[in-house]
């Protein structure tokens, strides 16, 4: 195979390559076996025509196109590997020469990854708003939330206040006409929770059990039901009950109810503090990592990012998101119906920062290459086991799905991120 690659820009070029006679013969054999099944010739049963007779009647050239289709993918991949390039999109392939008895010559217009000129990526100074410190107030807030979760709702005769729960029947209408989904009975609603349309809950503050009130609201302009968006509505609402939270005593007994692993309130507070310290430390490290990566990307220079890479990233992100939804039992159709959005909306959402994601990946890849990381078999095995546990899949299935080269690439990317983050200094 003869291969050459000539760049026409930083991200485009022409790949010229040939297909040798032995490979062509293999392709012709495959092509003949495929097309002969549909050929009927007097003196032969359908599909039983000999190769010699076929060539005599139609000429071997009649098989060229099918033969090329059979061998082109492998030949193109081999040419790409020999040229040492990384195409990022489907090529536009043209046949330069296709004659009987000669090697076939082809050209492919390819889009390749852009050149990345790295700047500083180690020992970067970054600023982050996150902190690892845990205040007494944060511990008390966690404790209060746990106390609220164990509160009992007790019926009260007095007027509803913010934070109370009202049990209501309601019928909604727009211009005097009831609409689908606008009716409910014995619905429990915590006032101030923001569960209902803005303005609804506020109008129930001060009501008592047995009262019926008219609640007037306006649906938000971006409301998921387009026929209601921006319209004024009237909800005739009957308050059946008003309930107030009765908080349990904050003592050792409650501490044991909240967490069976502790014996006292002080032990619970200490445990909450430790958990908060761990979560804040993780958030802090994530913030440092993000800031350091952004700085490393800003220090690098990439002349041009091909549109094809942007499109590929958008579709990759969309497929990953929708695939995650399907794992939760939500089909794409169901997701778009629930959210009141469309595939175009999701495309625009991921398109907004696709350039940043592609640019970041390119810089991290370049850093991994500059550091010349090596990956051991033990690291690959550990990565496979980690992924198997993460996605609840057998190790053998992960091994079949993910090529070793891809796993090594991902491990190298993680090592590059670690270099950027662990050497960074916070102002």
Swiss-Prot record:
GO molecular function: peptidyl-prolyl cis-trans isomerase activity; protein folding chaperone; ribosome binding
Gene3D superfamilies: 3.10.50.40, Trigger factor ribosome-binding domain, Trigger factor, C-terminal domain
Subcellular location per the Swiss-Prot or TrEMBL entry: Cytoplasm
Keyword Cell division: yes
Recorded catalytic activity of this chain's protein: [protein]-peptidylproline (omega=180) = [protein]-peptidylproline (omega=0)
Keywords, comma-separated and alphabetical: Cell cycle, Cell division, Chaperone, Cytoplasm, Isomerase, Rotamase
InterPro entries: PPIase_dom_sf, PPIase_FKBP_dom, Trig_fac, Trigger_fac_C, Trigger_fac_C_sf, Trigger_fac_ribosome-bd_bac, Trigger_fac_ribosome-bd_sf, Trigger_fact/SurA_dom_sf
Domain of life: Bacteria
GO biological process assignments: 'de novo' cotranslational protein folding; cell division; chaperone-mediated protein folding; protein transport; protein unfolding
Domain (PPIase FKBP-type) ranges: 163-248
EC number: 5.2.1.8
Catalytic class of the enzyme: isomerase
Signal peptide: none
Cellular component terms (Gene Ontology): cytoplasm
Family to which this protein belongs: Belongs to the FKBP-type PPIase family. Tig subfamily.
Function: Involved in protein export. Acts as a chaperone by maintaining the newly synthesized protein in an open conformation. Functions as a peptidyl-prolyl cis-trans isomerase.
Domain description: Consists of 3 domains; the N-terminus binds the ribosome, the middle domain has PPIase activity, while the C-terminus has intrinsic chaperone activity on its own.
Name recorded for this polypeptide: Trigger factor
Taxonomic lineage: Bacteria, Bacillati, Bacillota, Bacilli, Lactobacillales
Encoding gene per record: tig
């Amino acid at each position: 195979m003869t291969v050459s690659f000539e760049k026409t820009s930083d991200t485009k070029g022409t790949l010229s390559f040939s297909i040798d006679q032995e490979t062509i013969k293999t392709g012709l054999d495959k092509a003949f076996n495929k097309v002969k099944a549909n050929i009927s010739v007097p003196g032969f049963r359908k599909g039983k025509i000999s190769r010699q007779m076929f060539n005599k009647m139609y000429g071997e050239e009649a098989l060229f196109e099918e033969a090329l289709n059979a061998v082109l993918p492998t030949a193109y991949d081999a040419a790409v590997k020999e040229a040492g390039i990384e195409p990022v999109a489907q090529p536009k392939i043209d046949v330069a020469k296709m004659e009987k008895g000669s090697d076939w010559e082809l050209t492919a217009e390819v889009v390749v990854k852009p050149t990345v000129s790295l700047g500083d990526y180690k020992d970067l100074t970054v600023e982050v708003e996150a902190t690892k410190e845990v205040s007494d107030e944060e511990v008390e807030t966690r404790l209060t939330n746990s106390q609220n979760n164990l509160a009992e709702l007790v019926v009260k005769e007095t007027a509803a206040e913010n934070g109370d729960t009202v049990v209501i029947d309601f019928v909604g209408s727009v211009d005097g006409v009831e609409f689908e989904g606008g009716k409910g009975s014995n619905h429990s609603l915590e006032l101030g929770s923001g569960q209902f349309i803005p303005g609804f809950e506020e109008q129930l503050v001060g009501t008592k059990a047995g009262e019926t009130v008219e609640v007037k609201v306006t649906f938000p302009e971006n409301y998921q039901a387009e026929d209601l968006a921006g319209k004024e509505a009237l909800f005739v609402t009957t308050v059946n009950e008003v309930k107030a939270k009765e908080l349990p005593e904050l003592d050792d007994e409650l501490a044991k109810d909240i967490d069976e692993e502790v014996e006292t309130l002080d032990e619970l507070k200490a445990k909450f503090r430790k958990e908060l310290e761990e979560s804040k430390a993780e958030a802090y490290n994530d913030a440092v990592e993000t800031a350091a990566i952004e700085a490393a990307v800003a220090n690098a220079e990439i002349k041009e990012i091909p549109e094809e890479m942007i499109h590929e990233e958008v579709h990759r992100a969309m497929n990953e998101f929708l695939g995650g939804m399907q794992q939760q039992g939500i089909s794409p159709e169901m997701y778009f119906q629930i959210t009141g959005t469309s595939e175009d909306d999701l495309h625009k959402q991921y398109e907004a920062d696709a350039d940043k994601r592609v640019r970041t990946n390119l810089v991290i890849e370049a850093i991994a290459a500059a550091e010349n990381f090596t990956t051991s078999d033990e690291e690959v095995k550990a990565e496979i086991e980690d992924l198997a546990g993460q996605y609840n899949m057998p190790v053998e299935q992960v091994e079949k799905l993910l090529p070793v080269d891809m796993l090594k690439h991902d491990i190298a990317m993680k090592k590059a991120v670690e270099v950027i983050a662990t050497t960074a200094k916070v102002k």
